[in-house]
Amino acid sequence: MEQTLKGDETGWWVVSDAVQIWMPQGELPRGTATEWSLQGKTARQIGEWQGQPAWLVCQGRDTDMASVRQLLDQDVGLFQLAGRGVQLAEFYRSHRFCGYCGHEMVRSKTELACLCHHCKERYYPQIAPCIIVAIRRGEEILLAQHNRHRGNMYTVLAGFVEVGETLEQTVVREVMEESQIQIKNLRYVSSQPWPFPHSLMMAFMADYAGGDIKHDPKELRDAGWFRYDQLPQLPPPGTVARRLIEDTVVLCRAYHENEG
């Protein structure tokens, strides 16, 4: 429930606007509302971390606004909590007016929703389901350079679920569209909220079944098979992509040792 801060409230402070968060000194603020000059602001508690509440304040600051990605290197759990705040702040920012009748909406006091008192429509935060998949061929893993990524990082294949698709169908389609290969033995591994801006990554592993790699230049700069002990630059620890790669490397190494 939203409340006006008196000043003595304490905890972690997710001050967010336009998919960015306030990171003074490169860290998420922690302490009382008064310490961070937040008294009088409207806030909502969005969870807890290390025994202290986490508060969302939907407002930008003139300085020290940064991407929530910075928290990945500090603490994965804190990154996930701050990412929740970023997604909620963006939801509120993009749902000021009703999409049906155009009237101004208000935030629900009892749930995470926006309400239109004119036509009685109710809106909830949108989540975009995505798949991400690691594919193994013997002692090798398929890795690719995505056009949307900077630098020389290689990672596994990923894509959005389309209307009417199952997750399994999405994996097969995305792999075919991006690499032109077939897969088998598809199995679910894990999931990770990804606040860029509001995705939910659902991770899979699969085995190579056939075909030659022909990467889609609209999506990928490069794609290829990499031996488990000759890997390129990888995604940072804490990402589900890195976990998939590390888990697949274990299988690749076991395959090499058994075949050797």
Curated annotation (Swiss-Prot):
<feature type="binding site">
    <location>
        <position position="116"/>
    </location>
    <ligand>
        <name>Zn(2+)</name>
    </ligand>
</feature>
<feature type="binding site">
    <location>
        <position position="178"/>
    </location>
    <ligand>
        <name>a divalent metal cation 3</name>
    </ligand>
</feature>
<dbReference type="GO" id="GO:0110153">
    <property type="term" value="F:RNA NAD-cap (NMN-forming) hydrolase activity"/>
</dbReference>
<feature type="binding site">
    <location>
        <position position="124"/>
    </location>
    <ligand>
        <name>substrate</name>
    </ligand>
</feature>
<feature type="domain" description="Nudix hydrolase">
    <location>
        <begin position="125"/>
        <end position="248"/>
    </location>
</feature>
<feature type="binding site">
    <location>
        <position position="101"/>
    </location>
    <ligand>
        <name>Zn(2+)</name>
    </ligand>
</feature>
<feature type="binding site">
    <location>
        <position position="174"/>
    </location>
    <ligand>
        <name>a divalent metal cation 2</name>
    </ligand>
</feature>
<keyword id="KW-0479">Metal-binding</keyword>
<feature type="binding site">
    <location>
        <position position="174"/>
    </location>
    <ligand>
        <name>a divalent metal cation 3</name>
    </ligand>
</feature>
<feature type="binding site">
    <location>
        <position position="158"/>
    </location>
    <ligand>
        <name>a divalent metal cation 1</name>
    </ligand>
</feature>
<dbReference type="GO" id="GO:0000287">
    <property type="term" value="F:magnesium ion binding"/>
</dbReference>
<dbReference type="InterPro" id="IPR022925">
    <property type="entry name" value="RNA_Hydrolase_NudC"/>
</dbReference>
<comment type="function">
    <text>mRNA decapping enzyme that specifically removes the nicotinamide adenine dinucleotide (NAD) cap from a subset of mRNAs by hydrolyzing the diphosphate linkage to produce nicotinamide mononucleotide (NMN) and 5' monophosphate mRNA. The NAD-cap is present at the 5'-end of some mRNAs and stabilizes RNA against 5'-processing. Has preference for mRNAs with a 5'-end purine. Catalyzes the hydrolysis of a broad range of dinucleotide pyrophosphates.</text>
</comment>
<feature type="binding site">
    <location>
        <position position="119"/>
    </location>
    <ligand>
        <name>Zn(2+)</name>
    </ligand>
</feature>
<dbReference type="InterPro" id="IPR049734">
    <property type="entry name" value="NudC-like_C"/>
</dbReference>
<keyword id="KW-0378">Hydrolase</keyword>
<dbReference type="GO" id="GO:0005829">
    <property type="term" value="C:cytosol"/>
</dbReference>
<feature type="binding site">
    <location>
        <position position="241"/>
    </location>
    <ligand>
        <name>substrate</name>
    </ligand>
</feature>
<dbReference type="GO" id="GO:0000210">
    <property type="term" value="F:NAD+ diphosphatase activity"/>
</dbReference>
<dbReference type="Pfam" id="PF00293">
    <property type="entry name" value="NUDIX"/>
</dbReference>
<dbReference type="InterPro" id="IPR050241">
    <property type="entry name" value="NAD-cap_RNA_hydrolase_NudC"/>
</dbReference>
<dbReference type="GO" id="GO:0006734">
    <property type="term" value="P:NADH metabolic process"/>
</dbReference>
<comment type="similarity">
    <text>Belongs to the Nudix hydrolase family. NudC subfamily.</text>
</comment>
<dbReference type="InterPro" id="IPR015797">
    <property type="entry name" value="NUDIX_hydrolase-like_dom_sf"/>
</dbReference>
<dbReference type="GO" id="GO:0019677">
    <property type="term" value="P:NAD catabolic process"/>
</dbReference>
<feature type="binding site">
    <location>
        <position position="69"/>
    </location>
    <ligand>
        <name>substrate</name>
    </ligand>
</feature>
<comment type="subunit">
    <text>Homodimer.</text>
</comment>
<dbReference type="GO" id="GO:0035529">
    <property type="term" value="F:NADH pyrophosphatase activity"/>
</dbReference>
<keyword id="KW-0862">Zinc</keyword>
<feature type="binding site">
    <location>
        <position position="178"/>
    </location>
    <ligand>
        <name>a divalent metal cation 1</name>
    </ligand>
</feature>
<feature type="binding site">
    <location>
        <position position="219"/>
    </location>
    <ligand>
        <name>a divalent metal cation 3</name>
    </ligand>
</feature>
<feature type="binding site">
    <location>
        <position position="111"/>
    </location>
    <ligand>
        <name>substrate</name>
    </ligand>
</feature>
<dbReference type="InterPro" id="IPR000086">
    <property type="entry name" value="NUDIX_hydrolase_dom"/>
</dbReference>
<dbReference type="Pfam" id="PF09297">
    <property type="entry name" value="Zn_ribbon_NUD"/>
</dbReference>
<feature type="binding site">
    <location>
        <position position="98"/>
    </location>
    <ligand>
        <name>Zn(2+)</name>
    </ligand>
</feature>
<dbReference type="GO" id="GO:0030145">
    <property type="term" value="F:manganese ion binding"/>
</dbReference>
<keyword id="KW-0464">Manganese</keyword>
<keyword id="KW-0520">NAD</keyword>
<feature type="binding site">
    <location>
        <begin position="192"/>
        <end position="199"/>
    </location>
    <ligand>
        <name>substrate</name>
    </ligand>
</feature>
<dbReference type="GO" id="GO:0008270">
    <property type="term" value="F:zinc ion binding"/>
</dbReference>
<feature type="short sequence motif" description="Nudix box">
    <location>
        <begin position="159"/>
        <end position="180"/>
    </location>
</feature>
<dbReference type="InterPro" id="IPR015376">
    <property type="entry name" value="Znr_NADH_PPase"/>
</dbReference>
